[in-house]
């Protein structure tokens, strides 16, 4: 049984699973579907088409599933898909997609989106991602699993943030961030790798040392990307972690931060 505050406004087409809670003065529009155990706090606005999974918590003053302000958007039906076990804190804004891309913005599972963060249209957020307060993602941004973007990080449209990467506070990202790399500054510069995060997540010391050597190959030896990639082929075959790092470099479309 769901617990709906009588002061909430819910469109009759909304689909609510069991044990959903909706707080006072929240507005849930047509085309929204909410999974079991999700809690929608007070003063939240949800607009469809939006599908929200199980056991999420959305805090007050968040706007989730609103139309994109992208000038290409002409009212086409687009959607937002949110997975399970996400925490969306106060004042977060998440926009639906555009038909010029996938027509879908996606947020995976077990993510923490902190206060006043923004996720732009057509962005794809993986799992276990943390967006700290006031981080803003432009449209078409991809953020891979376990990335952490510190407060006031700004990400240009179409950038790709690699798995396990980390940005310092106030970083302005205009190119792709390879997996595991830490970036700081405006404009962003690569400083090291997220070794502390790797240890917390149980990476072996052998894998960490291999990634350290791979980082030096790309960032400290004055090689071109093609030359560095050739040098990393052998360690990538030995260590899956190095293969992930190498793939994030080779598949970059905007060029990597160096």
Swiss-Prot record:
UniProt keyword list: Acyltransferase, Cytoplasm, Lipid A biosynthesis, Lipid biosynthesis, Lipid metabolism, Repeat, Transferase
Q: What role does this protein play? A: Involved in the biosynthesis of lipid A, a phosphorylated glycolipid that anchors the lipopolysaccharide to the outer membrane of the cell.
E.C. number(s) listed in UniProt:
2.3.1.129
The family assignment reads: Belongs to the transferase hexapeptide repeat family. LpxA subfamily.
Q: Which gene is annotated as encoding this protein in its UniProt record?
A: lpxA
Q: Which domain of life is it from?
A: Bacteria
What GO annotations for molecular function exist for this entry?
A: acyl-[acyl-carrier-protein]-UDP-N-acetylglucosamine O-acyltransferase activity
> What pathway does the UniProt record associate with this protein?
Glycolipid biosynthesis; lipid IV(A) biosynthesis; lipid IV(A) from (3R)-3-hydroxytetradecanoyl-[acyl-carrier-protein] and UDP-N-acetyl-alpha-D-glucosamine: step 1/6
Catalytic activity line of the entry: a (3R)-hydroxyacyl-[ACP] + UDP-N-acetyl-alpha-D-glucosamine = a UDP-3-O-[(3R)-3-hydroxyacyl]-N-acetyl-alpha-D-glucosamine + holo-[ACP]
Gene Ontology process terms (BP): lipid A biosynthetic process
Keyword Lipid metabolism appears in the UniProt entry = yes
Question: What broad class of enzyme is this?
Answer: transferase
One Pfam family of this chain? Hexapep
GO CC annotation, single = membrane
Q: Does the keyword Thylakoid apply?
A: no
Its organism's taxonomic lineage begins at:
Bacteria, Pseudomonadati, Pseudomonadota, Gammaproteobacteria, Pseudomonadales
Q: List the disulfide bonds.
A: none
Q: What is this protein called?
A: Acyl-[acyl-carrier-protein]--UDP-N-acetylglucosamine O-acyltransferase
Name the principal localization, coarsely classed.
Answer: cytoplasm
Q: Where does this protein reside within or beyond the cell?
A: Cytoplasm
Quaternary structure note: Homotrimer.
PROSITE patterns from the entry? HEXAPEP_TRANSFERASES (PS00101)
């Amino acid at each position: 049984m769901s617990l709906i505050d009588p002061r909430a406004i819910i469109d009759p087409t909304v689909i609510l699973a069991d044990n959903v809670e909706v707080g006072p003065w929240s507005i849930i529009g047509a085309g929204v579907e909410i999974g079991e155990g999700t809690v929608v706090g007070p003063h939240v606005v949800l607009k469809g088409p939006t599908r929200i999974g199980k056991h999420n918590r959305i805090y007050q003053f968040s706007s989730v599933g609103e139309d994109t302000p992208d000038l290409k958007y002409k009212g086409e039906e687009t959607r937002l898909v949110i997975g399970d076990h996400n925490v969306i804190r106060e004042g977060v804004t998440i926009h639906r997609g555009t038909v010029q891309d996938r027509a879908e913005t996606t947020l995976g599972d077990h993510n923490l989106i902190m206060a006043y963060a923004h996720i732009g249209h057509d962005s794809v957020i993986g799992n276990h991602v943390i967006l700290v307060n006031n981080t803003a993602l432009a449209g078409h941004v991809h953020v891979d699993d376990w990335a952490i973007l510190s407060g006031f990080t700004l990400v240009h449209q179409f950038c790709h943030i690699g798995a396990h990467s980390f940005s310092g506070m106030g970083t302005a990202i205009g190119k792709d961030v390879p997996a595991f790399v830490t970036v700081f500054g405006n404009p962003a510069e690569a400083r090291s790798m997220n070794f502390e995060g790797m240890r917390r997540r149980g990476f072996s010391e052998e894998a960490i040392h291999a990634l350290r050597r791979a980082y030096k190959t790309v960032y400290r030896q004055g090689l071109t990307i093609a030359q560095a990639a050739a040098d990393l082929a052998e360690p990538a075959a030995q260590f899956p972690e190095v293969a992930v790092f190498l793939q994030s470099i080779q598949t970059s479309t905007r060029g990597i931060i160096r």
